[in-house]
Amino acid sequence: YNIWDKLNLSEKIAYDYAQGTNDVLWDRHSNNGAPGGVMQRIVNRNDQLNTQTQLSYINSFGLHNIDALLGFETQDTEYAFNYMAGQDYPGDLYELTNAGSTSAETNRQSYRMTSFLGRANYNYADRYYLGLSYRTDGSSRLARENRWGSFWSVSGAWRFIDESFLNPVKNVLTDGKLRVSYGVNGTQPSDYYAYMNLYKYGIIYN
């Protein structure tokens, strides 16, 4: 959406949903089957919602070119796992409701990440470049007192092929650019709840 002249606002929302069910049966006649047969059912579900809000400004003043952006992003992810098993079936109708004994296990994990970011790029005559970026990320995978982290970078580049002293070799060297950058980045734990003390319990019915 064009707010004013070279100033634009964009909003993107993406939602992904996936679910899969896997049934495994060892009947009474298979090598791994119990006398009454065994049936397992595994159901996996993944939900992910991403939002991205960006305010961008792109403009040129003679040989000066500016590209700036401010953004806000969120990512919400939920994973659910359900496992059910039945055995000691009286006949060949292998449904969990017909099992002589059953067991079940369930697991659910959720994760959220929120980000504020900004960047600015400047170049003069498409020859000399300067770039700055900064972002702050908050992740639910980290303890509350360490949940937020800030990361930044600065870069510069020189397209030397456009310099006049290289005119004699431009028929051989078609492009050339030097770029340097420095910054700070980070990664988050792969475990959703590594910072917490977790307890596991189970109930078995016969």
Annotate each PLM feature.
Residues 1-26, 35-206:
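Extracellular/periplasmic, surface-exposed regions of secreted and cell-surface proteins
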